[in-house]
Amino acid sequence: MARMGISKGGSGKEAKKPPLLLGRFEVGKLLGQGNFAKVYHARNVATGEEVAIKVMEKEKIFKSGLTAHIKREIAVLRRVRHPHIVQLYEVMATKLRIYFVMEYVRGGELFARVARGRLPEADARRYFQQLVSAVAFCHARGVFHRDIKPENLLVDDAGDLKVSDFGLSAVADGMRRDGLFHTFCGTPAYVAPEVLSRRGYDAAGADLWSCGVVLFVLMAGYLPFQDRNLAGMYRKIHKGDFRCPKWFSPELIRLLRGVLVTNPQRRATAEGIMENEWFKIGFRRFSFRVEDDRTFTCFELDDDAAVDAPTSPPDTPRTVDSGDVGAAPTRPRKAGSLTSCDSAPSLLEGRFGLGGSSRRRSSLNAFDIISFSPGFDLSGLFDQDDGGGAGAGSIPEQQKHTARFVSAAPVEVIVATLEAAAAAAGMAVREREDGSISMEGTREGEHGALAVAAEIYELTPELVVVEVRRKAGGAAEYEEFFRARLKPSLRELVCDDRPCPEDSGELSRSL
């Protein structure tokens, strides 16, 4: 009886939950660790989103002289936003630690799959296509990984590849005057011969060599350059001494012989790899756009919609300016805030088919209307603080690039005017499922392609409020589009007797 009483009393106590990390994240199991960091699975309790959090001790970082290394990794991850690269969502710090909040990739390392044996040819091809796509995207932005291997390649729950661990990466700014890198980086079995020689090397070519080794491993189940000791393996790498198994097709062998060339001047480029017949099987070039800081929307470039949409000139290289960056994800999905699609929706769908009604939101309340007035923005009183936001009195970036105006013009006229302004700037226009209009650039700048959203709200049966805001792309590019194209086109539609300011330090929140 006494034992039962003790047991009952113990079970009656509620288990004390551990405190939330930074007030937002419920930390789970340890996913992995290295010399300077541990990575945990975590969940944002407010949104339910699963993330991976990389935790680094500041003291270790400072003592090891890795401060510049960490800053470079942050800069690199912010520069390479791509559907096949693990995304950095935010960086936070306390007095003792630095935290990287990153995309959580559920499927784990590609290495674990290879360890069970060689992959089916179709799977190996798809992973290689996605790897080369991501690597080419990085190179076009002056970023070089320098440690490509199956352990640094993850697979998500949709079966798509994600390149991770840019800790050893380099940027073009770090090259010497000879245009080459001189730092030994990488894992010996995957390192190019010119890197082993410890002379200057072209980091792009070295990355592609590593991609070739990865392809061989995926298809064969073992390394192309093997020996009983490291010195013997180095000799084989320097000579390019490898043999392909009998199940490799002639086209695959031709591809590998072109990539695993010891002379970097003769080695296949990323574009050359993409032209190989074995590589092109099932390969779909696609463009993508980053929205809301972490959502990818992908569009195939080879479908009719993309051909009909305004595009860059035909002689523009397909791999950089147009955002044509590789193999499309396997199927439409939304997982971990990542949205992808197999094929592009029509960029000019539903031009006037909605009759205006579904574009209008008839539930504007008093707070909405007040917030439309400059100087009376109450959103800060109601928006949840994410803990990493701006300080009191600062203007959120989205509000800096948002404009609103009241109009008595028919919805169809407003939409036609928006489309004309977008077309004049070489942008495509499409209507989203929520009724908003998206104007999307076809060329990628440093911050990705420009994307501008326009929403039309019903104020009264005779009046509407039009809100225009930047969704993606650079602030300077948006400001140029707004002042040169959008404001002049919409001026006649504004139901307001106040003059429009021609010049101001930042964009006005009303036209």
UniProtKB/Swiss-Prot annotation:
Protein source organism: Oryza sativa subsp. japonica (Rice)
Ranges where the Protein kinase domain occurs: 25-279
Sites where the protein binds ATP: 31-39, 54
Protein task: CIPK serine-threonine protein kinases interact with CBL proteins. Binding of a CBL protein to the regulatory NAF domain of CIPK protein lead to the activation of the kinase in a calcium-dependent manner.
Name used for this protein in its record: Putative CBL-interacting protein kinase 13
Keyword RNA-binding: no
InterPro entries to which the protein is assigned, alphabetical: Kinase-like_dom_sf, NAF/FISL_domain, NAF_dom, Prot_kinase_dom, Protein_kinase_ATP_BS, Ser/Thr_kinase_AS
Cofactor(s) required for function per UniProt: Mn(2+)
GO biological process: signal transduction
Record's keyword terms, sorted: ATP-binding, Kinase, Manganese, Nucleotide-binding, Serine/threonine-protein kinase, Transferase
Domain NAF: 321-383
Top enzyme category: transferase
Gene Ontology molecular function: any one: protein serine/threonine kinase activity
UniProt comment concerning the protein's domains: The activation loop within the kinase domain is the target of phosphorylation/activation by upstream protein kinases. The PPI motif mediates the interaction with the ABI (abscisic acid-insensitive) phosphatases.
Active-site residues, as the UniProt record annotates them: 147
Ranges where the record places region PPI: 400-429
Region entry Activation loop, spans: 165-194
Enzymatic reactions: L-seryl-[protein] + ATP = O-phospho-L-seryl-[protein] + ADP + H(+); L-threonyl-[protein] + ATP = O-phospho-L-threonyl-[protein] + ADP + H(+)
EC code: 2.7.11.1
Keyword Translocase attributed: no
Stretches the record annotates as Disordered: 307-340
